[in-house]
């Protein structure tokens, strides 16, 4: 009798374990939400403007208020891509905005983020000399790469 009870319990444990594995497997197949940049203004610039430093930008969505200063810390959502379209970094992947001091990022970000107001969105084409230069970032950004960013400035902290 004891042996039959143990076998019955083992059978139920096997069924429960299999059911749990199936549920977890199904949950792994469900696509997680993908966060992407918000909408651009209908009248957003289609052409890039180039600054004297070589940074190219276009305002995709106007914000309100004063833009950040080079010494400010900002909260942003962003995606960074190489010229071939491959994504090398993104806050959208985690669904959590990032915080950066503009004095601690590549020069192209420091300059570019000062051109957009909170609530706004900007597209930046950062030449190598304002990005990671001739060295790049091993395993992520090739030497001499132009960096392409879409950045939503959520707020100045």
Explain the meaning of each model-derived region.
Residues 2-157:
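Cross-family detector of peptidyl-prolyl cis-trans isomerase
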